[in-house]
From Swiss-Prot:
Similarity comment: family membership: Belongs to the frog skin active peptide (FSAP) family. Temporin subfamily.
Protein name per its UniProtKB record: Temporin-PTa
A GO CC term attached to the entry: extracellular region
Tissues with expression: Expressed by the skin glands.
Modified residues (Leucine amide): L13
Disulfide bonds: none
Lineage: Eukaryota, Metazoa, Chordata, Craniata, Vertebrata
Physiological role: Has antibacterial activity against the Gram-positive bacterium S.aureus ATCC 25923 and the Gram-negative bacterium E.coli ATCC 25726.
Length: 13
């Protein structure tokens, strides 16, 4: 789960 979130962070930024 967290692994996916960490990959989505750069997209949100």
């Amino acid at each position: 789960f967290f692994g996916s979130v960490l990959k989505l962070i750069p997209k949100i930024l």
